[in-house]
Amino acid sequence: ISQDSVANHCKITNSVILDFNKSQRNETDLWVLFKGRHNELDHCYIAGKSNRGPTVRIDLAGNNSIKNYHKITNNYFGPRPPKGGPSAETIQLGNSFTSMAPSYTLVANNFFDHCNGEVEIISSKTNFNEFRNNVFYKSEGSLVTRHGNYCIIDGNVFIGDENSEQIGGIRLIGTGHWVTNNYF
């Protein structure tokens, strides 16, 4: 298996990834990395990541990974302790170098429970993504359109905690986003 390989039309479903950390907290690791097109992560239980690096990352390097139409749906993302600083998102879509690339990734019907890795629970750095009907429960951070444009953020629920001042919501950067029917 090469780091340059891509996967198309693959699915990770009904799986558990729990406390699968490297021994050194500052070593970067990724629990789920998407490259290619039309891949899915659904009905999984993912919790306990404490290392540097996003839990799930969508990689758009190369023409074979843009317009990817990936789906991240119906998952439980469990507690992630604060890392301190960046590079601890629960979900990262793209990066600064691919911020103008179209992704068309759907993130829907997920439960984010105490996802406190950093200030961005979801970091969207690509175009044309949809975030629908997710629940963010006592998670210290926000859904952020960090780079990129034309995202739909609809029907999400953000449940805070009066004991934390770090609870976020939605932070918009870019053009053409539609934000509708969200509850805070």
What is the predicted function of each stretch?
Residues 6-21, 37-50, 66-82, 101-118, ...:
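Right-handed parallel beta-helix
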Residues 1-3:
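Blade-loop segments of beta-propeller domains
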Residues 23-24, 29-31, 52-55, 90, ...:
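Structural detector of coil-to-beta-strand junctions
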Residues 29, 42-45, 49, 53-59:
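Long, acidic/serine-threonine-rich intrinsically disordered regions with weak helical/coil propensity
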Residues 32, 58-64, 94:
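Active-site cleft segment of glycoside hydrolase catalytic domains centered on the general acid/base Glu
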Residues 61, 94-96, 127, 148:
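Active-site beta-loop-alpha junctions enriched in small/polar residues
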Residues 89-100, 116-120:
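Glycine-rich phosphate-binding "P-loop"
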